[in-house]
């Protein structure tokens, strides 16, 4: 971490189809080897499948899924006198969004459907309905923070 100055945040342009910045961030996290067109086709294909399957606005369902996976508490390690404590801290909104995106993508990659489009659409539908691996990850994170509430006075 630099001591001189804080690195400025890069501005992410909205995506072409929906004009949504969060969707672009999602595609950027999904992308491998700079192949943005592949990531776009996967995400747009998944949103089309959601629209066909759920008969709802796919973008709204995407944002609902993201909000259902966003954590508001997490644990951070803190060394105090030779012992390491897991201290619960609140999650900043930018980090919460980044974690939600990462968790949804990793949960989708771990699913058993044939194509990534199918996996992603299924995981987004599950997350929007408060189930699935990504939501379980969030619940586990919150449970960890709740279990270590006794160490919250070590917060910095």
Curated annotation (Swiss-Prot):
Cellular component annotations (GO), alphabetically ordered: small ribosomal subunit
Pfam families per record: Ribosomal_S7 (PF00177)
Molecular function GO labels: rRNA binding; structural constituent of ribosome; tRNA binding
UniProt KW rRNA-binding keyword: yes
Alphabetical list of InterPro entries matching this protein: Ribosomal_uS7 (IPR000235), Ribosomal_uS7_bac/org-type (IPR005717), Ribosomal_uS7_CS (IPR020606), Ribosomal_uS7_dom (IPR023798), Ribosomal_uS7_dom_sf (IPR036823)
PROSITE patterns: RIBOSOMAL_S7 (PS00052)
Record-linked Gene3D superfamilies: Ribosomal protein S7 domain
Keywords for this protein: Ribonucleoprotein, Ribosomal protein, RNA-binding, rRNA-binding, tRNA-binding
Superkingdom of origin organism: Bacteria
GO biological process: translation
Keyword GTP-binding (UniProt): no
Quaternary structure and partners: Part of the 30S ribosomal subunit. Contacts proteins S9 and S11.
Family label: Belongs to the universal ribosomal protein uS7 family.
Primary role: One of the primary rRNA binding proteins, it binds directly to 16S rRNA where it nucleates assembly of the head domain of the 30S subunit. Is located at the subunit interface close to the decoding center, probably blocks exit of the E-site tRNA.
Protein name in UniProt: Small ribosomal subunit protein uS7
Species name: Rhodospirillum centenum (strain ATCC 51521 / SW)
């Amino acid at each position: 971490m630099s001591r001189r100055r804080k690195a400025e945040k890069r501005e992410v342009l909205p995506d072409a189809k929906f004009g949504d910045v969060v969707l672009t961030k999602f595609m950027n996290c999904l992308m491998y080897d700079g192949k943005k067109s592949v990531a776009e086709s996967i995400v747009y294909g998944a949103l089309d499948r959601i629209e066909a399957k759920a008969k709802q606005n796919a973008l709204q369902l995407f944002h609902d899924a993201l909000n259902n996976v966003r954590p508001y508490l997490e644990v951070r390690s803190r060394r105090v006198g030779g012992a390491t404590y897991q201290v619960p801290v609140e999650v900043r909104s930018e980090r919460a969004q980044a974690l939600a995106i990462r968790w949804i993508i990793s949960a989708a990659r771990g699913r058993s459907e044939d194509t990534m489009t199918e996996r992603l659409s299924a995981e987004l539908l599950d997350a929007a309905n408060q189930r699935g691996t990504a939501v379980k990850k969030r619940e586990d994170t919150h449970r960890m923070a709740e279990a270590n509430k006794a160490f919250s006075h070590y917060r910095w």
